[in-house]
Amino acid sequence: MHKRQITVAVVDDDPNILGSVRELLNANCFITEIFASAEGFLASGVIPRVDCLLLDIQLAGASGVELRDHLEACGSKLPVIFMTGLADEALHRQALNAGCVALLHKPFLEHQLIDAIEKAVP
């Protein structure tokens, strides 16, 4: 495991996902910040403290891909892990082409999430 605690921001409009992922990450000694929207994440001011962004592709309001594109346009190098419950191949390609570190399919296993974070924040 890492020598310092890693802060992971999670953006998903499903409160059940937010709660489950927060519990899983906290149990694995990660600091977790959760947000129900891309807009809430951007307005929070946490970006400078975040090491990795776990981001749902399909959100109400701005999509996960739009948020990732916005961050990149602002010069952010924040590593992004996309997650989705959709089986849309075109959407998956769009997410991978957007430069994410990993794409997790909901429901995902604990080790898949931890492995993706460790890949994103070596």
Predicted regions mapped to residue ranges:
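C-terminal output helix
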Residues: 90, 108-118
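Two-component/phosphorelay signaling modules centered on CheY-like receiver
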Residues: 15-33
